[in-house]
UniProtKB/Swiss-Prot annotation:
Family: Belongs to the tRNA(Ile)-lysidine synthase family.
Record-given protein name: tRNA(Ile)-lysidine synthase
GO molecular function, one term: tRNA(Ile)-lysidine synthase activity
A single Gene Ontology CC term: cytoplasm
EC number(s) from the headed UniProt entry: 6.3.4.19
Amino acid sequence: MTEKLLQMMQEKGYFNQHKKVLVAVSGGADSMSLLHFLYNHQKDLDIQLGIAHVNHKQRQESEYEENYLRHWAKEHKVPFHYSAFSGKFSENAARTFRYDFFKRIMKEADYSALVTAHHADDQAETIFMRLLRGSRLRHLSGICDVRSFGTGQIIRPFLHIPKDQLPVTFHFEDRSNSSLAYLRNRIRLTYLPTLSQENPKFKEHLCLLADEIALMDKALEELTKDITITDLSVFQQQTDAVQHLLIQSYLESFPDLQLSKGQFNQLMSFLRKKTSGKMPLKNGYVLVKTQTDFLITKEEPISLSSPSLLEFGKSIVFEEYLLTFSEPHVVSNVDTINIWSDAPIVIRHRHEGDRIDLGTHHKKIRRLFIDNKISEKDRQKAIIGEQDGQIIFLYVAGRLYLKKRPKNAILYGTVVIYKKF
């Protein structure tokens, strides 16, 4: 089985882009199996290991386990990174503490990936737990084997392997794993074994379901990539079913905003109406809707505010930027724009149908956002400069897009954009 595991990892290319990887090790069976496997196959996978361990200070044995791992790391010449949990303990608080610690070590010690020992049984448990809690369909895709994390990626190379097929090695037993006081333990020790008596492949089928949902979600993302979700004219042209999926996708940007079915339906009803306004949501969030756009935010965004007028010799503050319009000059390390007219410049956010003359062609601002993969958040903050009824510059996500220089034009002044701190 070890050779099959190695072959699978190589075929999937989990470590092709990584040299230094940080292995999360608790001392339990799964993480110790992962540690020994990766250590024994460092050359095959062309990686260098580091160990990250968090002592949660909840069991007497934790000190011994920490010392064992520290000694093992020293003996095998593997860097050992350690932290002790502090504060009021809960499962969520401990998880947040662990992953914040992992991110910090990745950044400080230049690891490009965190590797964890989640396996197929963990995947089945996660999906079943979400089913019990009434999660939406897209959340039943379960755990990803590779995704962005911190300054690199998190990789779960065992995710498609059942626990009973993992290499067996020395490990510590956490007695809390056998306590039925925890839902996940009840799922692992009671619910899934009972259902597996009806169908021995029940856990496997849960994982296959997750794979199908993940594929469907990926297909939806590709099919809707050119749709600006927060553009009302575009959104309202879609069918009810597509609108439903688009808003679910948009809500993924707000992980601490978990709407009930009733609240979700109210949100959809509000978006389908012709009226503008604000709708309070949960956790301090509000849905803000104008005649042309909408967005969810914790504060009413400047992107829905009135335009400002920038005149020659003056400065204005717009969002987190200070813009000045003065005599032609060069300023190092800031964004500068040459201006070919003395007319005041309207500083605003985008409107439906905005276009800019890039020289070789006119381009819709919306299409420019799509082609350059500008995020929804950055689109809302994009700054447009309009002079004499024409867009002369677009500033978005730290990038400038300029209107073609007028023929035979004489340089009149310079606009400088400073980021405020």
